Amino acid sequence: MTAILERRESTSLWGRFCNWITSTENRLYIGWFGVLMIPTLLTATSVFIIAFIAAPPVDIDGIREPVSGSLLYGNNIISGAIIPTSAAIGLHFYPIWEAASVDEWLYNGGPYELIVLHFLLGVACYMGREWELSFRLGMRPWIAVAYSAPVAAATAVFLIYPIGQGSFSDGMPLGISGTFNFMIVFQAEHNILMHPFHMLGVAGVFGGSLFSAMHGSLVTSSLIRETTENESANAGYRFGQEEETYNIVAAHGYFGRLIFQYASFNNSRSLHFFLAAWPVVGIWFTALGISTMAFNLNGFNFNQSVVDSQGRVINTWADIINRANLGMEVMHERNAHNFPLDLAAVEVPSTNG
């Protein structure tokens, strides 16, 4: 009797594509989030490079005074930037096909919107891809949660702030000096240095740097030597080894005596959670602060808070900051308006005659 064995029907093309996309054996994991991440980030990066090199000047304030941002129009690496979309466009969605010509699209700063929207989609998908890969490998999801902090910060300055201010022209320019200009104008208009959420962000970033340096130096100083004196201590580590590579008891004892006992972690898991949570929470708060100041819920104002018995103002640092803010405000967009809002709101004295 002869048995006939039929070959199992091969998986469909779509099935093989799905298996390849979700395979953790690839050198670089793609994932379903990666299907959207790759084209959006490639688009944002390509347009950024081309525009940074060759984009013509942009009428950022909508007053027919174009501002140059590209290298071919007189800028260098420090001064160059992708100039934000014109105030004449406001918050309108402005793809190339909405303009009468490519020249008009470039003049009104269309590349900025294109780059920012693709970039935000891309980094959000990168965060989703981190979660997806963690899920496939049976890991916990906290890598994606930590990455949500810079994603929130980027979304705040590139999307939420322009929405609150009513125009993409108020978004952060994509360049070094453009970033500093954004920071200075933000301080002038919103007094961000006096906002508690910004203070928490400063503590998060500087504190995170301090804790990272402390942790790295403590671990490096308490390695368990597996090599001779003639070899680097780093050569004594084998990838995937089960043994501890450093003596946490020695590190705990050192730091506990340097400061005091309870300033030092004796639990490695608690320590690493703290190292991750401190900067992440700080940056979350800063992003939240930017998002509230976008709608003009600004930093604290203690101007002229201290007076003497005669009612005369005794200047404090709050008043110094206020004068600096006014100076910065009158300098920016100097041709777009005659006076900044603070000065324009002052009642004009009446004259007889």
Swiss-Prot record:
Q: Does the keyword Nucleotide-binding apply?
A: no
Annotated residues that bind Fe cation are located at H215, H272
CDD domains registered for this protein in UniProt:
Photosystem-II_D1 (cd09289)
Keyword field: Acetylation, Calcium, Chlorophyll, Chloroplast, Chromophore, Electron transport, Herbicide resistance, Iron, Magnesium, Manganese, Membrane, Metal-binding, Oxidoreductase, Phosphoprotein, Photosynthesis, Photosystem II, Plastid, Thylakoid, Transmembrane, Transmembrane helix, Transport
Cofactor binding: number and manner: The D1/D2 heterodimer binds P680, chlorophylls that are the primary electron donor of PSII, and subsequent electron acceptors. It shares a non-heme iron and each subunit binds pheophytin, quinone, additional chlorophylls, carotenoids and lipids. D1 provides most of the ligands for the Mn4-Ca-O5 cluster of the oxygen-evolving complex (OEC). There is also a Cl(-1) ion associated with D1 and D2, which is required for oxygen evolution. The PSII complex binds additional chlorophylls, carotenoids and specific lipids.
Q: Which residues bind chlorophyll a ChlzD1?
A: H118
**InterPro entries listed in its UniProt record:** D1/D2, Photo_II_D1/D2_sf, Photo_RC_L/M, Photo_RC_L/M_CS, PSII_D1
* Catalytic reaction equation(s): 2 a plastoquinone + 4 hnu + 2 H2O = 2 a plastoquinol + O2
Name the Enzyme Commission number(s) assigned to this protein.
Answer: 1.10.3.9
Residues binding chlorophyll a PD1, per UniProt: H198
**What does the miscellaneous comment read?**
2 of the reaction center chlorophylls (ChlD1 and ChlD2) are entirely coordinated by water.
What's the stated role of this polypeptide? Photosystem II (PSII) is a light-driven water:plastoquinone oxidoreductase that uses light energy to abstract electrons from H(2)O, generating O(2) and a proton gradient subsequently used for ATP formation. It consists of a core antenna complex that captures photons, and an electron transfer chain that converts photonic excitation into a charge separation. The D1/D2 (PsbA/PsbD) reaction center heterodimer binds P680, the primary electron donor of PSII as well as several subsequent electron acceptors.
Protein name as catalogued: Photosystem II protein D1
Task: Name the species this protein comes from.
Answer: Calycanthus floridus var. glaucus
Q: Which gene encodes it?
A: psbA
